[in-house]
């Protein structure tokens, strides 16, 4: 006799909002939504991508393939969560990756960023006071996702963390 293990698949198709001023402007999109149908967005020539995961890398390549000439990916830390292959493909396609930039708001011209201060181990310990104003046609926020699945949101036995991801327990296989 073999034991069976139930498996629950819950998708996280919802964009995670940053809660910053300007993220609802007409030229600001969320990565997961943009990737559903990139051709439905007039992306422009210059694109700022906020985030450094695989979705951010996919957004950058989609924007370049859609005709954007300047695509810059902004990462808060010195590390990215995207796979090294994704990063390499983006750079080969012409995207620029800028480390140590945290978005504070999005104004009429584009994202307003602060530069990170790193300790000896490369961890962010603070931010410089000076703000960097980036001018671009389009901003795409690709800084994580959250659960948008009704099952996860309405079932008490399923516990999600602050990012909307399911928490595992002792009985989780």
Place the predicted regions along the sequence by residue.
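Glycine/threonine-rich flexible loop motifs
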Residues: 17-22, 126, 150-155
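Short gly/ser/thr-rich secondary-structure transition/capping motifs
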Residues: 27-34, 119-126, 161-166
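Feature captures the FAD/FMN-dependent oxidoreductase FAD-binding
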Residues: 1-20, 104-112, 138-140, 146-148
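Conserved beta-strand-loop-beta-strand element in the redox core of flavoprotein oxidoreductases
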Residues: 1-7, 25, 107-133
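Rossmann-like dinucleotide/flavin-binding elements
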Residues: 14, 33-84, 132-133, 138, ...
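A conserved beta-strand/loop element that lines the FAD pocket in flavoprotein oxidoreductases
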Residues: 1, 94-102
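Short acidic, glycine/proline-enriched helix-loop-strand junctions
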Residues: 23-27, 42, 80-96
């Amino acid at each position: 006799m073999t034991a069976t293990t139930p498996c629950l698949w819950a998708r996280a198709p919802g964009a995670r909002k940053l809660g910053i001023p300007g993220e609802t402007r007409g030229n600001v999109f969320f990565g997961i939504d943009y990737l559903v149908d990139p051709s439905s967005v007039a992306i422009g020539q210059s694109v700022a991508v906020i985030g450094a995961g695989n979705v951010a890398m996919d957004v950058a390549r989609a924007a370049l393939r859609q005709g954007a000439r300047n695509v810059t990916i902004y990462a808060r830390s010195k590390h990215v969560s995207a796979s090294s292959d994704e990063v390499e493909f983006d750079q080969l396609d012409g995207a620029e990756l800028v480390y140590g930039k945290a978005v504070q708001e999005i104004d009429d011209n584009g994202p307003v960023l602060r530069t990170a201060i790193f300790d000896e181990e490369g961890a962010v310990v603070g931010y410089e006071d000076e703000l960097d104003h980036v001018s671009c046609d389009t901003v795409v926020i690709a800084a994580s996702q959250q659960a948008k699945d009704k099952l996860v949101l309405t079932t008490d036995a399923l516990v999600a963390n602050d990012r909307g991801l399911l928490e595992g327990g002792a009985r989780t296989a």
